[in-house]
């Protein structure tokens, strides 16, 4: 079959199971070949081929609603709904999104990227369906990893209480990105080995009906026996007690089992949970045998060997630099512990976990819990390092405010993937953290210009004993600069002048410093002398240096790879307003008031006007203007 010519999933209705098996194999070959060139979430998608095909054959999308939790496993869904012809553009600028996208297809009814949201969305859709009097099926598909998220458990509780008709597909592959952890994961493990729940339940019901209805103590004893037998023999009682009809576990690669149970679920009133066992990476040995999460999402790779295509002589990643520096310091300070919400591989904490297993806590997809657990550790004079992506820190905002900063606890927050991340798009860009952190009392916020300064900032954060401190660092590799052998501490709230200048000042930090220096070099050729300041402390500001700059009356350009509204540039405007009686000449560059889609970071920066050429253009506009004299002149 020509996968690129598929227009909609209606053709599946006429295929036999044997033909579906052939289609499954063809889709897997297509995914393995295509993703070897572009990269993407190969592991999750290889695992849900049969499940996705079965869902589209049994139900009628888009009338029936599929909600793909997290959404990285939606590639097969995209192929079956007519987007194969655009698959070569996957995760590229203006191309197919790597996650469900409502404006991309009518079959994408729920946008995702973060985990554990599908059940709440499904509850809303089911409530709307019932209010409108329609009869479509609502089918959220959630992984066993996402099920550990608190929001998913809140939704299970509410759905069970409301008894809305809904078919929840639990896609159980024993992993989220890294292997799953926690009591719920252990419970699901017991379910996997317990056999067919519905068969056992039906047999028990038959047995119970044969117990004679008698009065008094004997009747009460019989009821207790029934209840005890249920809990002893039927592991699905967890979901049943929440109000769900539990079906499974089902082989997620068997069409016979999938169709039998989906048809049973369609006839069942109230919420149903169908427990489907799948193999992440199925059909491609390197991905299928992956135990660490390496093949969850990848860059390009060689199909025959499974080797990843890496840039030559790349510097170590920022995640490695930070985690390894923390690991080094942990050898000297037994109070240092590390916490990650299900991202030990992405945060490069495998080495720390191997050396200090008792001081490493992977709490699962539970960012709120991770933040407050860090606070609890800090109250006992421990030194918690909370490794978390910028985009996921959004989910723990209240805990950072209420539990960490309000109590002024010594928690080191390592904000990974800060700034634009590229191909994962809107849901993963790390551009909001400055705006939602800098106004919180007690918190120090900083970002290094390179990996050498980065290791010193990690040391500074670990040695800091006056409250919470956060360090932003980008996705990808460092610049390859020379590294100091001895770690230093950087005075809190101090900036540094990287290049002198007398006509204008650029205040920036982190990833935008090389661009600012390159622009200043070009402008020097035109006779414009531009000072470049490494404003490495976003909070607190270096007030002494900033006052000196304002007193000089020079025009200022702030640059940040983060949202402008409420960001670093805003803090400079606020400071200038509070300390001067006139409006200073200050221009700001940063992320505009919009969600930034997927594409290469370079392409995205070009699109929003954050290139070296844009810096040069803005400085040219600033420098001809006659500047005011500063305070005390």
UniProtKB/Swiss-Prot annotation:
Residues bound to Mg(2+): 144, 173
Assigned EC number: 2.2.1.7
SMART domains from the UniProt entry: Transket_pyr (SM00861)
Cofactor note (record): Binds 1 Mg(2+) ion per subunit. Binds 1 thiamine pyrophosphate per subunit.
Catalysed conversion reaction: D-glyceraldehyde 3-phosphate + pyruvate + H(+) = 1-deoxy-D-xylulose 5-phosphate + CO2
Biological process (GO), any one: terpenoid biosynthetic process
PANTHER family for the chain: 1-D-DEOXYXYLULOSE 5-PHOSPHATE SYNTHASE-RELATED, 1-DEOXY-D-XYLULOSE-5-PHOSPHATE SYNTHASE, CHLOROPLASTIC
Complex and partners: Homodimer.
Entry protein name: 1-deoxy-D-xylulose-5-phosphate synthase
Origin species: Bacillus licheniformis (strain ATCC 14580 / DSM 13 / JCM 2505 / CCUG 7422 / NBRC 12200 / NCIMB 9375 / NCTC 10341 / NRRL NRS-1264 / Gibson 46)
Gene behind this protein: dxs
């Amino acid at each position: 079959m020509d996968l690129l010519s598929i227009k909609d999933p209606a053709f599946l209705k006429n295929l036999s199971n044997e033909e579906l098996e052939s289609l499954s194999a063809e889709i897997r070959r297509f995914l393995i070949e295509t993703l070897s060139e572009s990269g993407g979430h190969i592991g999750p998608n290889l695992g849900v081929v049969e499940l996705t095909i079965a869902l589209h054959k049994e139900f009628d999308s888009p009338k029936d609603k599929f909600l793909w939790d997290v959404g990285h496993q939606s590639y097969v869904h995209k192929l079956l709904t007519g987007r194969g012809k655009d698959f070569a553009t996957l995760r590229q600028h203006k191309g197919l999104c790597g996650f469900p996208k409502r404006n991309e297809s009518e079959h994408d009814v729920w946008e995702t990227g973060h985990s554990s949201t599908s059940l709440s969305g499904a509850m809303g859709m089911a409530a709307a369906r019932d209010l409108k009097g329609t009869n479509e099926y609502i089918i959220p598909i959630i992984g066993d990893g996402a099920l550990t998220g608190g929001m998913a458990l809140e939704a299970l509780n509410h759905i069970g209480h409301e008894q809305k008709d809904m078919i929840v597909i639990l896609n159980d592959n024993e992993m989220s990105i890294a292997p799953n952890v926690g009591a719920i994961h252990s419970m699901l493990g017991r379910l996997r080995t317990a056999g067919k729940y519905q068969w056992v339940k039906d047999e028990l019901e038959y047995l119970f009906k044969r117990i004679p209805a008698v009065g008094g103590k004997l009747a009460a004893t019989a009821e207790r026996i029934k209840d005890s037998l249920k809990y002893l023999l039927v592991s699905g009682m967890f979901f049943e007690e929440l109000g769900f009809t539990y079906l499974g576990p089902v082989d997620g690669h068997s069409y016979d089992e999938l169709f039998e149970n989906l048809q049973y679920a369609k006839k069942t009133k109230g919420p149903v949970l169908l427990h489907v066992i799948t193999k992440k990476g199925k059909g491609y040995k390197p991905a299928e045998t992956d135990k660490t999460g390496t093949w969850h999402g990848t860059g390009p790779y060689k199909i025959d060997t499974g080797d990843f295509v890496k840039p030559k002589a790349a510097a170590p990643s920022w995640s490695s630099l930070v985690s390894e520096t923390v690991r080094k310091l942990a050898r000297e300070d037994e109070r240092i512990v590390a916490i990650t919400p299900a991202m030990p591989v992405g945060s490069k904490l495998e080495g720390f976990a191997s050396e200090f297993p008792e001081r490493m806590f992977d709490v699962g997809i539970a960012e709120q819990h991770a933040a407050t657990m860090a606070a609890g550790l800090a109250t006992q004079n421990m030194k918690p390092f909370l490794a978390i992506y910028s985009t996921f820190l959004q989910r723990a905002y209240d805990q950072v405010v209420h539990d960490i900063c309000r109590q002024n606890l010594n928690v080191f927050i390592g904000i990974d993937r800060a700034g634009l991340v590229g191909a994962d798009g809107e849901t993963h860009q790390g551009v909001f953290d400055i705006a939602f952190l800098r106004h919180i009392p007690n918190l120090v916020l900083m970002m290094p210009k390179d990996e050498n300064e980065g290791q010193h900032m990690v040391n500074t954060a670990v040695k800091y004993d006056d409250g919470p401190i956060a360090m932003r660092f980008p996705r990808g590799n460092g610049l390859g600069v020379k590294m100091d052998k001895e770690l230093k501490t950087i005075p809190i709230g101090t900036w540094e002048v990287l290049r002198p200048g007398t006509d204008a000042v650029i205040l920036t930090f982190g990833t935008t410093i090389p661009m600012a220096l390159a622009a200043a070099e070009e402008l020097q050729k035109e006779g414009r002398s531009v000072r470049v300041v490494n404003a490495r402390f976003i909070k607190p500001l270096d007030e002494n240096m900033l006052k000196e700059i304002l007193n000089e009356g020079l025009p200022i350009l702030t640059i940040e790879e983060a949202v402008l509204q409420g960001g670093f540039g805003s803090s400079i405007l606020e400071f200038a307003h509070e300390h001067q009686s006139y409006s200073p000449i200050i221009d700001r560059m940063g992320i505009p008031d919009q969600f930034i889609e997927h594409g290469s970071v370079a392409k995205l920066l070009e699109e929003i006007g954050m290139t070296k050429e844009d810096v040069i253009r803005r400085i040219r506009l600033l420098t001809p203007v006659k500047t005011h004299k500063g305070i005390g002149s």
